Each structure stands twice: as structure tokens, then as C-alpha cells.
Regions:
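Positively charged, polar, low-complexity stretches
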Residues: 2-44, 48-86
């Protein structure tokens, strides 16, 4: 599927806010709302990849706990891991 940037951002915002668990809805929603308009194309693609991970592994990754999968090191994942939810 070939999405333009506007469509991709819209898809990412939706997926960030409707994850399945309230905690991840709030955390990823706040993260996405803060950074979505500051990201370049590569970062948007990496954010979409991050959203493909299940909530449990994302929550553990964010909190520095052991994950069941290998999560690659990139700018988005580092930005997410260091994001301070307020």
C-alpha cells in the first residue's frame, strides 16, 4: 500500500490512540501527538513499524524491561524509550 504522508500520519495517529490497552493508548497517543509533525519520512516508517509491535512488548521496552522480541535501534525507538509521559 502506497500512502501519501498525510494519509500515513492519519493512520499512525489513529493506531497510536486505539491500541487495545488504555495505558498504551495514552502513552503512544501522547508520544505521537507530540512528535508526528516533526518526523521525516524515515521516522514515520519506523514509527509505523513500532506500532506493529504488541502492547506487552512495547510497554516492557518503554519501561526498560525484558521483551520477547528484538527491537531494533533507531531514532524513533530511542525517542519513544526516553519519552516522558505527563
Amino acid at each position: 500500500m502506497n500512502l501519501n504522508i498525510y494519509q500515513l500520519k492519519k493512520k499512525i495517529i489513529y493506531r497510536s490512540n486505539y491500541r487495545g490497552t488504555k495505558e498504551m493508548d495514552k502513552l503512544l497517543g501522547a508520544f505521537t501527538n507530540k512528535y508526528i509533525n516533526k518526523l521525516n519520512n524515515e521516522d514515520l516508517i519506523n514509527l509505523e513499524k513500532l506500532l506493529n509491535l504488541d502492547d506487552n512488548n512495547l510497554y516492557n521496552f518503554y519501561n526498560g524491561l525484558k521483551t520477547d522480541i528484538k527491537i531494533e535501534n533507531n531514532n524513533i525507538n530511542l525517542l519513544f524509550k526516553n519519552f516522558k509521559y505527563e
